[in-house]
């Protein structure tokens, strides 16, 4: 991922100005800054859901990123977990983890039992082993940190090429945040 002269302003206020960065496969990068410093804006620009001001460009795998929907970004192997995660409150944990994903394997559609097993494995991978909920529990019964765990599990489900987490551990307990 390469960013060249990326700027973004809202009226007369610059959220980002002249950003040049390179990220490489396998690298974990953390952006740290005050509230309003432009971290979320940069995440949206890299994922292609927001355009930089004219003159700047983002290149991922030698392809220039243009403005597109979150679904198109996902199809390009880019997954984002925003601080205001979008979950379907009345659906189960496993339905949310698989939301928007084609549920197939090499033999056809994946069974609900397989979805549940995969959801349990993903949630354990990031440190959730609660006896209070099961993958069939609805999201509206979860704490803020548990909801964030569902969103992160969704992001890592198919091992996207680029996963961006925008304040992913804000609502999590310290032990859960360390695992993430």
Model region roles, listed by residue range:
Residues 1-180:
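Glycine-rich phosphate-binding loops of nucleotide-dependent enzymes
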